[in-house]
Amino acid sequence: MNKKSYLRRVRLPRTPADWLEAVMNFIFFLCGMLAVCCVVLISVYMVVSGVPAIHKIGLFKFLFGTKWASTAAEPLFGILPFILSSVYGTLGATILGVPIGLLTAVFLSKAADPKLRTVVVTAIELLSGIPSVVFGLLGMQVLVPAVAKAFGKASGACLLSAIVVLSIMILPSIVSVSVTALNAVPPEYEQGSLALGATDTETWFKISIPAAKSGIAAGVVLGIGRAIGEAMAVMMVAGNSPNMPDSLFRSVTLLTTAIAKEMSYAGGLQRQALFSIALVLFAFIMLINVVLNVVLKGGNRDE
């Protein structure tokens, strides 16, 4: 390609409007690169800070050890209880929150009166804006005593309380994304089903929800990401003991709460181990994002 043909393809700015366009494009490029740089820097920092402790402790002992005693004379750094507590807590919140969120989304999208829909949508939006510490405070003052009284336990600060709080916190993500997905279903699908004699309920569950499955799945994955990354609210209701989660009523520590609980006074290998926990948590979040992208791409191919 000679110089003249290149200049014809890439027009140099000549007018003030051209210069403004070039400047704005450069600003857009910088903003995009800033986001990329943030992700890269965080990833590098997590790896650099987290790998040394794993190297000293041993990968198998770190990931599959069942004892965490970071301040003992002979410290132990097994995070399997934290991993399982996070997995069980997230799974329980998903099992509890997804049906409620999905049914709420179907109601808002298909059945609700416009005035009632406005009220419910406003409430859900407010729910999404409530700080985590408020959820934790309400859980600590209301839910924890209720669990202890209902099940005859000395303390209600346990895995079950964490699951209930997390299930409430993930509702806005599931509901909002699912409503958008259900509203995007072509009305011809539902009209055809109704014309064949199906009831409204049959149409919603056999036509609308399957047609919106990729969007609903995206909402569920976003809710899972919110649940596994939550720290403050969970720390206030879970009990924060490094136990294996062999019961819903066990006091447990999650990956996030382990970091939040000990980082303020940690030093030496203990501090490095907390960064290693953060690296494991970061890997979980990255995996969830990959799953979300796969789900969205799969939905686009189906469409």
List where the protein language model places each region.
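Amphipathic cytosolic juxtamembrane alpha-helices at the membrane-cytosol interface
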Residues: 21, 100, 113-118, 186-187, ...
